[in-house]
Amino acid sequence: MAGEEDWIELKFRLADGTDIGPSKYNQSMTVSSLKEKLISQWPKDKENTPKTVNDMKLINAGKILENNRTLAESRLPVCELPGMIITMHIVLRLPTLDKKSEKLQNDPPMKNRCVCTIL
């Protein structure tokens, strides 16, 4: 079938070792739209959940996939066998700096500061 070649079977491994998939995806799909689909399929029992596509990185064969490229452009056919399920890793980069900066802004400034004087 010619239409079968347009599809790729992917499985996604999370940091804790659990998987999403395997499922078939069209190779013309962009990495960004794939990430949106993954956010909607994200396991509800997980503590960390990505909110946007920028909260996660997809890694295939050691390469970080770019959001604006298609799955066909992002594939590394050297590592693949026909009919094989490709495992990609998901790395979350959730915004933690906002919490730290809010904490620093909400903390009162230190009033007792040590001052050294050399005579």
From Swiss-Prot:
Superkingdom classification of source: Eukaryota
InterPro entries, alphabetized: MUB (IPR017000), Ubiquitin-like_dom (IPR000626), Ubiquitin-like_domsf (IPR029071), UBL3-like (IPR040015), UBL3-like_ubiquitin_dom (IPR039540)
Lipidation (S-palmitoyl cysteine): C114
Topology within the bilayer: Lipid-anchor
Organism: Arabidopsis thaliana
In-chain residues carrying the UniProt-annotated modification Cysteine methyl ester: C116
Induction: Not induced by pathogens, cycloheximide and ozone treatment.
Lipid moiety-binding residues (S-geranylgeranyl cysteine): C116
Protein name: Membrane-anchored ubiquitin-fold protein 6
Note: Heat stable and remains soluble at temperatures exceeding 90 degrees Celsius.
GO cellular component terms given for this protein: plasma membrane
Major site of localization recorded for this protein: membrane
Function comment: May serve as docking site to facilitate the association of other proteins to the plasma membrane.
Ubiquitin-like domain ranges (all copies): 8-76
Tissue-specificity statement: Ubiquitous.
Hydrolase among keywords: no
